[in-house]
Amino acid sequence: MKHLWFFLLLVAAPRWVLSQVQLQESGPGLVKPSGTLSLTCAVSGGSISSSNWWSWVRQPPGKGLEWIGEIYHSGSTNYNPSLKSRVTISVDKSKNQFSLKLSSVTAADTAVYYCAR
């Protein structure tokens, strides 16, 4: 029975659990009001060209996740309409990474920022 449960859990696991690809965000911990937040997500264990879309999300204190936007490895982007005027997401295939820039930040942008695929 233990083997059956393990099998069921493995099959039901999200794609990212089964993958060896790892994502690591980097950037400043603090940004001054009206400044620009710049974050980079390094992809390891696989090529950034192997997945269709790479995303940024954030979680404000005490709130749920908010989707910021996504980029295709070719450079095509989709953005959250509420943030679109302030967001730029770019990809650097030579460095196997993608980046987020959020301009004109305010206290309302306080959040934990995550990259995802």
Curated annotation (Swiss-Prot):
Keywords: Adaptive immunity, Cell membrane, Disulfide bond, Immunity, Immunoglobulin, Immunoglobulin domain, Membrane, Secreted, Signal
Gene3D superfamilies: Immunoglobulins
Protein known as: Immunoglobulin heavy variable 4-4
Gene giving rise to this polypeptide: IGHV4-4
Segments of this protein annotated with the region Framework-1: 20-44
Claim: Kinase is one of the keywords in the record: no
Cellular localisation: Secreted; Cell membrane
An example Gene Ontology CC term for this record: extracellular region
Domain of life: Eukaryota
Function of the protein: V region of the variable domain of immunoglobulin heavy chains that participates in the antigen recognition. Immunoglobulins, also known as antibodies, are membrane-bound or secreted glycoproteins produced by B lymphocytes. In the recognition phase of humoral immunity, the membrane-bound immunoglobulins serve as receptors which, upon binding of a specific antigen, trigger the clonal expansion and differentiation of B lymphocytes into immunoglobulins-secreting plasma cells.
GO biological process, one term: immunoglobulin mediated immune response
InterPro entries, sorted: Ig-like_dom, Ig-like_dom_sf, Ig-like_fold, Ig_V-set, IgHV
Domain Ig-like: 20-117
Region (Framework-2), start-end ranges: 54-70
Keyword Membrane among UniProt keywords: yes
Region (Complementarity-determining-2): 71-77
SS bonds (residue pairs): 41-115
Signal sequence extent: 1-19
Positions of the UniProt region annotated as Complementarity-determining-3: 116-117
Principal subcellular localization: secreted
Positions of the UniProt region annotated as Complementarity-determining-1: 45-53
A Gene Ontology molecular function term of the record: antigen binding
Subunit structure comment from the entry: Immunoglobulins are composed of two identical heavy chains and two identical light chains; disulfide-linked.
SMART domains on file: IGv
Region (Framework-3): 78-115
